[in-house]
UniProtKB/Swiss-Prot annotation:
Pathway: Purine metabolism; IMP biosynthesis via de novo pathway; 5-amino-1-(5-phospho-D-ribosyl)imidazole-4-carboxamide from 5-amino-1-(5-phospho-D-ribosyl)imidazole-4-carboxylate: step 1/2. The gene is purC. It comes from Pseudomonas putida (strain GB-1). GO terms for biological process: 'de novo' IMP biosynthetic process; cobalamin biosynthetic process. Signal peptide: none annotated. Its EC number is 6.3.2.6. This is Phosphoribosylaminoimidazole-succinocarboxamide synthase.
Length: 236
């Protein structure tokens, strides 16, 4: 597989074309950002940890019947993925109150949500990824009603699979965001799943083991990521 021109450079990953029109290469960088890119730092080993963590999770989801864009690891910081026509919407599943939900509704952090909530946000950094609903997605042509049904179904399936996986590792899956795209007519899970895009707390101590350590200046960010990977059995 030949790596060609950079197609897109995000806050923490770069996307490259290949000699296969249906495949791309994702490069996980050490860049770490918060507050819509207003704060950016370099954290050693982060790209490697997130790349291998993502590969492990995507393979677990594939085994559970969730279609993903992941194909294979290419190295410490790179993986091969399917080229998706991305839907510009973030799907957020919450099992416990945290983050923007606490700020928006004034509820106490850590409350268990029963049932888990499902939310949609427009993927737009300039607008701060605003909270939207299903009718916005259809009315503005960001996706179809049928695609939304499938995205919600897959998001809840991901929650079912990963909540158990993390629970078995002594961790609470507090919340997470997913992005989806279309590959040859099928809705497929895209982007990545790593501690950058979810909240994970130790079951016993409620210690934060995710990107909130960076956002809140708690320190030991990569050490926490590596501890999560170790508990799950991710080979680093």
């Amino acid at each position: 597989m030949e790596k060609r021109d950079e197609l897109y450079r995000g806050k923490a990953k770069s996307v490259f074309k290949t000699d296969d029109a249906d495949r791309l290469i994702l490069l996980f960088r050490n860049d770490t950002s918060a507050f819509d890119g207003k704060r950016i730092e370099q954290l050693d080993r982060k790209g490697m940890v997130n790349n291998k963590f993502n590969a492990f999770i995507m393979q677990k989801l594939e085994e559970a019947g969730v279609p993903t864009q992941f194909d294979k690891l290419l190295g410490d910081n790179e993986c091969l993925v399917k080229k998706l026509d991305m839907i510009p919407v973030e799907c957020v599943v919450r099992n416990y109150a945290a983050g923007s939900l606490v700020k928006r509704l004034g509820v106490e952090e850590g409350i268990k949500l029963e049932p888990s909530t499902f939310e949609l946000f427009l993927k737009n950094d300039e607008k701060g990824d605003p909270f939207i609903n299903e009718s916005h997605v259809v009315a503005f042509g960001w996706g179809t009603a049928e695609q939304l049904v499938e995205m919600k179904k897959l998001s809840l399936k991901v929650n079912e699979v990963l909540s158990k996986l993390f629970d078995d590792a002594g961790l609470l899956l507090v919340d997470f965001k997913l992005e989806f795209g279309v590959f040859h007519g099928q809705i497929v899970l895209g982007d990545e799943f790593s501690p950058d895009g979810c909240r994970l707390w130790d079951k016993e101590t409620r210690k934060k083991m995710d990107k909130d350590r960076f956002r809140q200046g708690l320190g030991d960010v990569i050490e926490a990521y590596e501890e999560v990977a170790k508990r799950l059995g991710v080979p680093l």
